[in-house]
Amino acid sequence: MRGFGVHSEVGKLRTVMVCRPSLAHQRLTPANCHDLLFDDVLWVHEAQKDHFDFVLKMQERGVEVLELHDLLGQTLANQQARDFLLDRRITPNVLGSQIAEAMRPWLDEMPAAQLAAFMIGGIAISDLPEVRAKSLMLSALPETDFVIPPIPNTLFQRDPSCWIYGGVTCNPMFWPARRAETLIQRAIYKFHPIFLGGDFQIWWGDSDQPFANASMEGGDVMPIGNGTVLIGMGERTTYQAVGQVAQALFRSKAAKRVIGCLMPKSRAAMHLDTVFSFCDRDVVTLFAEVVDQVRCYSMYPKDDDGTFEIHPENRPMLDVVAEALDLPQLRTVETGGNSYQAEREQWDDGNNVVALEPGVVVAYDRNTYTNTLLRKAGIEVITIRGSELGRGRGGGHCMTCPIWRDPAY
């Protein structure tokens, strides 16, 4: 029987969601990749092979792997789900009245799997020969223009939603290029048979309202156990979102402490998990240059309505996290090599590992210095190739959205 809920960062991983490289990545070009938040184009065929290897290695350890294209295709077989998604994606405000009116009947009749591929991979004008003939606006635009842009960052399933203890958040993303990802997750959680009627709550974010300055991405969120949640506040996650999530968790008594981790804002350290991740119950890997600058603020529930009080932590982040887990201290594995090598390996996601169970992680093979230090610390490191998958700045932790994970303490 499948369960729902993520109760630690290193307990036995039972169910996870991923997204394979696909049409969205085939449409990345040197001209558009930066707008779509990729640093480079992928060799898609090799990225697909490497992602398949990643999935296989998780399955060999008993992890159930759910794939986003498959989930979305199955979801869109439900007419109510199809209407939910298209009513929000195919609108005059997004496309213009004439284009929206021309496209909607075409999409309504499309097979579910093809519609799922287009919702992730984008729709170019060249995909619309019949619709284009009916629209003066479309006929005037180049065939390579996108009516609906691709969303290649679906590769990094950690971010658009995140499971925190007995529920999930649907995250309003910082950059507009990623916001359609959250709508897809909302549709899946509402309508897919796996989740329909499931024993979980949606803590926050399942709304069509504008979130203004409140943004959050799952790479910043870690339910570490013992009723504690770490949330990084750097480039992508804002205090406006953190406060609302803390309030929702406290109101439901789902957590007893939320630790906000104020980080420097930089592309290299866009999320907390790019500089800090758990490998075992008491082992973390980290990029000290950034982690040493993190300032922590603990939030505790004050009343049953979810209001909370904030306590500044005037001590290092590692001490705060160890105390929250009732540990005397954390053992640390810093990014390996000299200062040049460490900076390179952090950029290549050397600290962005995903634990399959206590003491077992998946990491990119290219980060040889850091992987060696992890093994010396007693961690089993399962490697996958990272030369293509890492071009969007994300490793094993970024590419996985755990849905069911055991406690570790």
Swiss-Prot record:
<keyword id="KW-0378">Hydrolase</keyword>
<comment type="similarity">
    <text>Belongs to the arginine deiminase family.</text>
</comment>
<keyword id="KW-0963">Cytoplasm</keyword>
<dbReference type="GO" id="GO:0019547">
    <property type="term" value="P:arginine catabolic process to ornithine"/>
</dbReference>
<dbReference type="Pfam" id="PF02274">
    <property type="entry name" value="ADI"/>
</dbReference>
<dbReference type="InterPro" id="IPR003876">
    <property type="entry name" value="Arg_deiminase"/>
</dbReference>
<dbReference type="GO" id="GO:0016990">
    <property type="term" value="F:arginine deiminase activity"/>
</dbReference>
<dbReference type="GO" id="GO:0019546">
    <property type="term" value="P:arginine deiminase pathway"/>
</dbReference>
<comment type="pathway">
    <text>Amino-acid degradation; L-arginine degradation via ADI pathway; carbamoyl phosphate from L-arginine: step 1/2.</text>
</comment>
<feature type="active site" description="Amidino-cysteine intermediate">
    <location>
        <position position="398"/>
    </location>
</feature>
<keyword id="KW-0056">Arginine metabolism</keyword>
<dbReference type="GO" id="GO:0005737">
    <property type="term" value="C:cytoplasm"/>
</dbReference>
<protein>
    <recommendedName>
        <fullName>Arginine deiminase</fullName>
        <ecNumber>3.5.3.6</ecNumber>
    </recommendedName>
</protein>
